């Protein structure tokens, strides 16, 4: 893995506008950063990214299978008891999932380490699957990278294939909250993939969902919603006043209820418990448990429910705060994880996001930040394969 500078396309703003990339600049700061690119060899991708992703995902599914049979685990995950049985039912029925993203730290001279699994509402999808590929095609044409360069990116192909597998004559609804540009773009992109698969689709904001007779969900025209993709956290749905309606399983949600076990930072201590010493895992433990690291080693504290680095704190071996990100999750239960520093290139720390669609590893995106904690504003940098 090498990073090098590349020229920015002179008409980048127009290209972004033409392709609906409305958030390539966030708060007057660069989000999509194509002034640099990462180069990987095919062997690095296959052995260090794709293969571990596939193995870790299967391990995660084993955790789900154990968790739905163990009330102690569900308690540690802070999942409300009201939903334990319906989550287990969702798993037994193999309610279909769509996608997820594993976040890795990789320094190049040791196996990748899994930091967390964003299995419910992962973003940076559009830029990983689509806009990054546009960059590759332009970069090859202009000669700034080898003309035979490739990219680890079959994300869009797999998404369309997955929507084909999920095809139904009933419309597929796509939902997110209002006033969230990145979420809206992600949902529109997924909706487009569904349409390419021949699936009728409709968009509705979460705030516009209605309740019909008997507690069915309806759209603004009072049509009953039977299937919906929601870029809205499962734990928020469970905590909502109407959350108990999830128990009736009238709608098919994507992501399904069993994903609440994987979209939880408590997954990390469970993986370490069931697969101790695995080369791609970091020692992790729940608050109140015996630390799984030696005295004097650095560690990270994370809320069980947290997104985009919110309320994550890094401590050194003397319990001094090294870095901290503010957020809205300070009151959530906490887990602890051995600290794995991100590789540093110049003034930036690099995080690899490895994508999974329907249980298959299929691509990646790279984020950079000037701090050790990756956030929603962290820059996205394209990659390519050569050699």
Curated annotation (Swiss-Prot):
Pfam assignment, any one: GSP_synth
Disulfide bonds: none
EC number: 6.3.1.-
Domain of life: Bacteria
Record keyword Magnesium present: yes
Entry's Gene Ontology molecular function annotations: ATP binding; ligase activity; metal ion binding
Transition state stabilizer, annotated site positions: 101
Family: Belongs to the glutathionylspermidine synthase preATP-grasp family.
The protein, known as: Putative acid--amine ligase YjfC
Organism of derivation: Escherichia coli (strain K12)
Lineage: Bacteria, Pseudomonadati, Pseudomonadota, Gammaproteobacteria, Enterobacterales
């Amino acid at each position: 893995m090498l990073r090098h500078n590349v020229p920015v396309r002179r008409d980048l703003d127009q290209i972004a506008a033409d392709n609906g990339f409305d958030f390539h600049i966030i708060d007057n700061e660069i989000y999509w950063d194509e002034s640099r690119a990462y180069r990987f060899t095919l062997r690095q991708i296959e052995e260090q990214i794709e293969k571990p992703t596939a193995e870790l995902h299967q391990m995660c599914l084993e955790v789900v299978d154990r968790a739905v049979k163990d009330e102690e685990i569900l308690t540690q995950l802070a999942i409300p008891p009201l939903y334990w049985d319906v989550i287990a039912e969702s798993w037994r029925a193999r309610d279909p999932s769509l996608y997820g993203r594993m976040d890795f730290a990789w320094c190049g001279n040791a196996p990748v380490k899994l930091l967390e699994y964003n299995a419910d509402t992962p973003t940076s999808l559009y830029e990983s699957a689509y806009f990054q590929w546009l960059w590759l095609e332009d970069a090859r044409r202009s000669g700034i990278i080898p003309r035979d360069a490739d990219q680890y990116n079959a994300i869009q192909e797999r998404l369309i294939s997955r929507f084909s597998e999920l095809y139904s004559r009933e419309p597929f609804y796509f939902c997110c909250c209002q006033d969230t540009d990145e979420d809206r773009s992600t949902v529109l992109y997924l909706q487009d993939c569904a349409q390419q698969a021949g699936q009728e689709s409709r968009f509705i904001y979460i705030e516009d969902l209605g309740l019909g007779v008997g507690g069915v969900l309806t759209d603004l025209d009072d049509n009953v919603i039977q299937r919906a993709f929601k870029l809205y956290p499962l734990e928020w749905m469970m905590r909502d006043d109407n959350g108990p309606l999830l128990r009736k399983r009238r709608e098919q949600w994507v992501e399904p209820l069993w994903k609440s076990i994987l979209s939880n930072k408590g997954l990390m201590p469970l993986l370490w418990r069931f697969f101790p010493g695995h080369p791609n895992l970091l020692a992790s433990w729940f608050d109140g448990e015996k630390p799984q690291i030696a005295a004097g080693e650095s560690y990270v504290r994370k809320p069980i429910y947290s997104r985009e680095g919110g309320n994550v704190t890094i401590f050194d071996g003397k319990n001094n705060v090294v870095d901290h990100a503010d957020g809205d999750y300070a009151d959530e239960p906490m887990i602890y994880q051995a600290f794995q520093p991100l590789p540093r290139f110049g003034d930036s720390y690099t995080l690899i996001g490895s994508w999974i669609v329907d249980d298959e590893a299929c691509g990646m995106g790279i984020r950079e930040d000037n701090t050790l904690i990756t956030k929603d504003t962290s820059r996205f940098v394209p990659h390519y394969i050569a050699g």
